Amino acid sequence: MRRPAKARSSKTRDGDLTSESYAMLRATVGAVTNRPLVEANIALPLHDGDDAYPQMLAAIKTAQKTVALTSYIFRSDKIGQEFIDALGEANQRGVMVRVLIDGFGSSRKTFRHFKQQNVPVVRFMNSIWPWQMHFLNLRQHKKVLIIDGVKAFIGGLNIADENTGRKRQKITVRDTHFRISGPVVRQITADFIDDWLFATGEVLDDALWNSDHHMSGKVKARIIVSGPDQETEQLSITLLSAITAAQKSIKIATPYFLPDELLMSALQLAATRGIEVKIVIPEFSDHAPMDWAMHAHIGPLLQVGCLVYRAPQPFNHSKLMVVDDAWCLFGSPNWDTRSMRLNFEMAIEVYDSLLASQLSLIIDQNGVKPMTLNELEARSLVVKCRDAAVRLLIPYL
């Protein structure tokens, strides 16, 4: 098994970011997103709720002008109440607060607790009317916190006690979140303004919700959003372009790996041309049918030499992609049809070898249990049939 590499300095590159392949990647993503790749950002990885939540709460408590929060799951548990209280206090001291939670992933109890604090909150696409039930499959899956238009927190982390091990609680969900500052925050804020308008009809003043940025970082970044409201499949095209640009390695960590045939073929082609393709999935996810479908789905990748590893418990919810230890992508999307086409998602692509190497190391450290073709073939006929049957439901999982 390949020994995980130590994080390299930003001057050492596995992939040549000046190559024609990366120039094509930059041009393609710029064309499909209609957003520039902006320089001078800072992106810092945060590990689990124990690392991320205190920084997020501190940022809310020191906010001076605006706070915007979007979350798919926002539980009304201990950590959820801490966030509700902090947002309520910010609202009381005159900070403009807007909270967008998903109507399916977050409960009415959470919504009521926000209302009790007089926090402006909306449940995204929440309806019990039969003629609007066709929207039930379209979920707001983004996890974003924006403070004063200056800094943002983004990644896979929901707001829930299972993400924290404070006070001797056991972490049951591992995750990787990110603290972002710099000009790319303007893109993140603009997307929230669009989502808020879509959900409520309220137009937020761009001048109030954005701020000038001090150009102090070295990271080039750009947001990619996906959803049924997009004319082009920004996320799928970005992933395909990144796979095509790879010169040495592709590493993926995702809680759910059920890509469509186009992405599967791209990964297979990458492996056949000598690219190291490494995919890390949980040993057990939080949905057994997803595990069954994944077992039926990854055989063709193993056959062409892709490496598939399992992250041991607790359930690893991180969503990371690294190419050549030079380019990386992180955010809310999973590698499944729901994230590519049905959910409203946000990811950030980053051109920075230091951050990419850090995330590459995280992926290597998480993936410690290799999956083999022999193991898949050893499944009983009944299990194989079950897994194959569930795999047919990929568009709906």
Locations of regions flagged by a protein language model:
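Catalytic-core elements of nucleic-acid end-processing and repair enzymes
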Residues: 319
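Active-site donor-binding acidic/aromatic loop of nucleotide-activated sugar
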Residues: 308-312
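Short, solvent-exposed amphipathic alpha-helical segments in soluble enzyme
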Residues: 266-270, 296, 365
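Helical hairpin unit composed of two closely spaced alpha helices linked by a short loop
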Residues: 256-277, 282-287
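Histidine/acidic-residue-rich catalytic or RNA/ligand-binding cores of hydrolases
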Residues: 261-264, 291-293, 323, 341-343
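N-terminal localization/anchoring segments of enzymes in phospholipid and broader phosphate metabolism
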Residues: 1-236, 241, 245, 285, ...
